[in-house]
């Protein structure tokens, strides 16, 4: 019996390298007796409803070939049915969530089929809208990175006022361009661009970050993941406020409605094949951090004390 009976493969529709890698994975998996479903992913393509319907949700592994955006889309559909995701950077940009293409061959592939891998669980958030109709028919929404509330006007740049409550206690009214509610995984995405903190993904925490607030007193706040966050629009005369999930449109937020955000029951499960996988090495490489110890790997003399010259 194969290590994985049913495997789904999602590849970037517009990337030739991604399609070629998907075909190769499919061939290798067929050779060991796996059932394989394959489909493109992108702005106009979503294979996950088909995958779930065709398998009844019984998927042993998802191989996602692309960048972080491809992984975020997979997580929103597959986390709820506890599918482990092998995320491989094929044609992606930054790749905070992905492993290098080398894991698709050689000893890494042997480790995959032998079950010699680790699972890294990443916390997710869920959001639901409450209040007067119209309310979305299909709730809740899920995110691996962040939920974002911001206006989306075609005619002009607008600011909004949002009332923020935590565990039923009103905390503040935030006047600005919007609000981010993020996971530790999302702290290196939109949140860090909005001057929020970087948080290690092993922590169970939620970060609330105002986007371009009009008050210097509006600062990012880090909360324990046990809290419930409620955000209500107080001023939106043009009815422009939208809820976004990992950069994808989720739902409009109408007057007198509240967005309730809390930790999702199911985390995203990332399958790790690299033996020396390190979150902080990823930060160093992606954010171009450096230090004397890293430099010492190339030039040991840099750690010697400076010599005094007359």
Curated annotation (Swiss-Prot):
- Signal sequence range: none
From its record, what is one biological process in GO terms?
Answer: NAD metabolic process
Top-level taxon of origin: Bacteria
Output the Gene Ontology cellular-component terms: cytoplasm
List, in alphabetical order, the Gene Ontology terms for molecular function in this entry. Answer: ATP binding; metal ion binding; NAD binding; NAD+ kinase activity
Q: Which reaction does it catalyse?
A: NAD(+) + ATP = ADP + NADP(+) + H(+)
Q: Where is the active site?
A: 68 (proton acceptor)
- At the top of the EC hierarchy, this enzyme's class is transferase
Assigned keywords, A-Z: ATP-binding, Cytoplasm, Kinase, NAD, NADP, Nucleotide-binding, Transferase
Alphabetized Pfam families for the sequence: NAD_kinase, NAD_kinase_C
Positions of NAD(+) binding: 68-69, 145-146, 156, 175, 177
Needs which cofactor?
a divalent metal cation
- Describe the function of this protein: Involved in the regulation of the intracellular balance of NAD and NADP, and is a key enzyme in the biosynthesis of NADP. Catalyzes specifically the phosphorylation on 2'-hydroxyl of the adenosine moiety of NAD to yield NADP.
Family per similarity comment: Belongs to the NAD kinase family.
Q: What is this protein called?
A: NAD kinase 1
Organism of provenance: Gloeobacter violaceus (strain ATCC 29082 / PCC 7421)
């Amino acid at each position: 019996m194969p290590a994985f009976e049913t495997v789904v493969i999602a590849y970037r529709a517009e990337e030739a390298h991604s399609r070629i890698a998907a075909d190769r994975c499919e061939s290798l998996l067929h050779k060991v007796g796996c059932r394989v479903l394959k489909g493109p992913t992108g702005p106009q393509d979503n294979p996950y409803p088909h995958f779930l319907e065709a398998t009844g949700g019984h998927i042993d592994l998802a191989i996602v070939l692309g960048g972080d955006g491809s992984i975020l889309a997979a997580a929103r559909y597959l986390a709820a049915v506890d599918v482990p995701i092998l995320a491989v950077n094929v044609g992606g940009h930054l790749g905070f969530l992905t492993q290098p293409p080398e894991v698709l061959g050689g000893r890494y592939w042997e480790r995959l089929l032998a079950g010699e891998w680790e699972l890294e669980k990443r916390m997710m958030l869920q959001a639901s809208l409450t209040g007067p109709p119209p309310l979305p028919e299909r709730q809740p929404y899920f995110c691996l990175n962040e939920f974002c509330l911001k206006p989306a006007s075609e005619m002009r740049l607008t600011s909004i006022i949002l009332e923020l409550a935590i565990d039923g206690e009103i905390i503040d009214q935030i006047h600005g361009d919007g609000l981010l509610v993020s996971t530790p995984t999302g702290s290196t995405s939109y949140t860090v661009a909005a001057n929020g903190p970087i948080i290690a993904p092993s922590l169970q925490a939620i970060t609330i970050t105002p986007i371009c607030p009009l008050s210097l007193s509006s600062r990012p706040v880090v909360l324990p993941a046990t809290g419930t966050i409620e955000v209500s629009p107080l001023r939106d005369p043009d009815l422009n406020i939208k809820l976004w999930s990992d950069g994808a449109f989720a739902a409009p937020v109408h007057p007198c409605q509240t967005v309730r955000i809390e930790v999702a029951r199911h985390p995203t499960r990332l399958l790790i094949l690299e033996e020396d996988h390190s979150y902080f090495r990823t930060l160093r490489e992606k954010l171009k951090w450096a230090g004397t110890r890293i430099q010492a790997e190339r030039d040991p003399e840099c750690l010697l004390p400076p010599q005094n010259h007359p």
